[in-house]
Amino acid sequence: MRYAIAVDIGGTFTDLVAYDHDARQVVYSKSPTTYDNFADAIFHCFEKAALTPAEARFLNHGTTLVINALLQRKGARTALVTTKGFRDILEIARGNRPDPFDLHYSRSEPLIPRELRFEVSERMAADGTIVTALDTNELERLAQRLTEEGIESVGIFFMNSYANPAHEEAAARCLQQLMPGAYVTHSTSLTRQWYEYERTSTVAANAYVGPGVDAYIRRLETDLGTGGFGGPLLMMGSNGGLLSVERTCEQPIALVESGPIGGCIGAGAYAEALGLKNVIAFDMGGTTAKCALVEEGRFSVESTYYVGGYTKGFPIQSPVIDIVEVGAGGGSIAWADAQGRLHVGPQSAGSTPGPVCYGRGGDKPTVTDANLVLGRLNPDNFLGGDLTLDVEGARQAIGDLGERLGYHGAEGPLQMAEGILAISTVIMGGAIKQVSVEHGLDPRDFALFCYGGGGPLHGVSLARELSIPLVIIPPEPGNFSAIGMLLADARIDRSETFTGLLDTETIARSRTVFEAMEAEAREALARDFGAQDVLLERHAEMRYRGQRHNIKVPIGRAGDVASIAAAFHRDYKRRYGHADAQAAIELQALHLAAFARQQRPDLACLPRQPDLESKVQERRVHFGGHGTVTARIFRRDALPEGFSDTGPALIEEYGSTTLVWPGDRFEIGTLREIRIHLAGH
């Protein structure tokens, strides 16, 4: 068992990275994602890398299984068991209209339909005292009915259970005994915060995806074991940490953004190694583009995440790195509406059939086809030559779309391709503004850190759109999310509802609660990972008294009222543009993050070995207002540390191509990263 291995299942490709800590060697592979059985793509990656599962010491795994099941409504047949009188909480929700200007607004249907939501007699008071005892006889009759209904999974939510989970825990034990083949989960095993709609939504989502995730992981463990794998399988959590299989099967909702998070962790590690305090992590894959901020070396982790977006989605109370995702990937389809307006995405051609240029039956033009028509992709060296791209097929598809929109003649396909990329740039720029400008931050104060198969190709265009002066392309950007998973630590988050005005007495009470959460987290990390050395971070959700929305503020172990208040005022002003130093501040919740360090690869060993024999070539490439010019083509593994040149240029490697615009200067850094300095910035 030589290798530490990470596998990332993306919307279009599945990536594998294997690192030998002793020999300090690395192996990469990539294979199209297989939607019928995700595990097939994992084993295809093993074959391409000439490795077997028996050579793996451990395997870190990120997957889009959970988010796909939620968005595509492909989960289990699920029932909700709740307190009498609260059957319709999923439909009542918050009773608000998130987008008041959308005249056709409609909220998404609940994951669990009304006929599968059931009430039982029980009630807790807000302080945790029992008002009405749990009727176990009623539960027994309900279990019989659920079995007859063919229910595969049950979510349990009782009012005020965050204050006293006894009834939920008793109901879960009862249903597990009476329905041994069903998946049973309850809200207080996932979150101990108030807000009844959010907790109900969380447990409903967890129950909905639970059977599928459990079956997938157990089958993958079995298949890996058959191949000789004897190490632990660890899952990439949405909080930026690794989770054990047991914890994942109990809390599969913790994987809701499992796939993209690995790249965020990798971006943070590289930013620290390169001495960059502030970077925007930008991941453009085949299906979507994602972005997140690293500010002062840290990611922001949100305690509530909206599946499908705030406007039409639904919330889950689970820690997720603050990441924004838009439907603008390499496979995003370009199309025209009835009014003759051009759109890009969110529909994607995926890996099957894929873009037109893949030659697998796709007939709708995509972002990848547009890049190929403009000369920005090498048709003979895509994925290292594993796939030859059909230039004429892409040109025909884009030309046909252009004809419908009035772009005729020989220049029509070029103009149409430029339009497709311009729209995708605006969409991706909007995502970056959402994580920066909407939080009171200026993207010009950050470096743009680009990875994914399409990130390096679009990074400079995006930086120009936002006036960002520096673009960083890490080694192996096409496999970078998997690299990030090898750089992740184990992490467990705990949270508690905690209310009170910010004063000395409240701070003293909070320390007692934090100490209890810390003891619980230490025990969990020791049990799951054998960890003895644990790092701890404390945060509090706070607001001005009388307000509705909270902000999350870091607080030190020795924090006093003055220092905590100062931190709150500072963060509040940055977020909203003002602060009131005289207003009373109140706490609403406490959050704890506990980390156990894992062995990491040496970043200097991650680039492939240089091939200094490669020769520089040339190709005609279209660069917007610069027209079609001759660009030099470099092989990335032929560029040594310190190499520098000026665009127009393309830097090709397995799985990705970096585009350098005319006049921009690029150089190879100490970790073999590409640094692109935009002209005029």
PLM feature segments, named:
Residues G155-N164, N206-V209, A417-A422, D445-G453:
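Conserved short loop/turn motifs at secondary-structure junctions
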Residues T63, F157-M159, S187-S189, S238-N239, ...:
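Glycine-rich beta-strand-to-loop/alpha-helix junction loops that act as flexible
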Residues Y28-T34, A79-G85, Y105-S108, V245, ...:
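Glycine-rich phosphate-binding loop of actin/hexokinase-like ATP-binding domains
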Residues G155-V203, A207, N381, L587-D611, ...:
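Terminal amphipathic helices with adjacent charged low-complexity linkers/tails
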Residues A6, F13-V17, Q25-Y28, P32-A41, ...:
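Conserved phosphate-binding loops in N-terminal lobes of ATP-dependent enzymes
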Residues M1-A79, A125, T132-G155, E168-S187, ...:
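N-terminal glycine/serine-rich phosphate-binding loop of ATP-dependent small-molecule kinases
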Residues I9, N137-R145, L276, G286, ...:
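C-terminal, non-catalytic interaction/recognition modules in large multi-subunit enzymes and RNPs
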